Amino acid sequence: PTPEELGDGIYRIYYSGRNNNNQSHISWVDVDLNKPYQVIKYSDGPVLAPGALGCFDDNGVTPSCVINLGNGEKALYFIGWNPGSTVRMHLFGGLAISTDNGKTFSRFSRAPIIERCSTDPYLNTAPWVVKIEDGFHMYYVSGHEWKNKDLPRYNIKMAHSKDGKNWERDGHVCIDFKDDSENALARPYVIFEDKLWKMWFAYKSQKYRIGYAESIDGIDWIRQDELAGIDVGNTGFDDDMIEYAAVVRYNDQHFMFYNGNNYGVDGIGLAVEK
């Protein structure tokens, strides 16, 4: 789930659903946090479909971040899925732009905005972008290695941009593995609050859990997973795994959208700060 604030407690939640060919498309629902269990509007259909055959996103697209640029323009950063041969899949970050306040989106480029490079030779995906005074920061998932065809290891790194489209990377790691058993650090979600940068992310040894980190400068981070504020449920759709958290603050209360068992097969969960 990728939320966008619309005002008065209404949030647009971008999500990916799969078709009969198991290809993900991006759609959205509007929810009112004053009535958090009520969906008030659905998109008429997907706002972004898989790319052309042979492109980095020809087998699916998943939303990662939405930024309102003003004057009716929005930037949708997304994950592009492409099946592999020697490895199970390739994942790269893309960008789509809306000039009609989010009614429709068009790709900025048919190529990824974060492709392979000398510091990131494997997958580069799940971009979360924040606007800063002199440009943009991106927190993204970077492949560290493939243990075998079906098991990649990936951590969270950082990139910088003046325009939000062209990115510079130096390999700086923001969130690294706790130990050798940890193989996945996924979906960074970053906010600035109370003079601190705060990040929620997913981490996995056997089953996904939601982690948390803080930073003074947005560059160097300290993991404090015990402060994530949530664990698996006792029963139900999230009793085995939880992942892909997105946290918003409304009326001095935090709301967390997240996925549960089997990567969200039952839909999107909502947790409310006590």
Regions found by a protein language model. Give the residues of each.
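Beta-rich carbohydrate-recognition and catalytic domains
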Residues: P1-N59, I67-Y122, V130-A186, I191-D240, ...
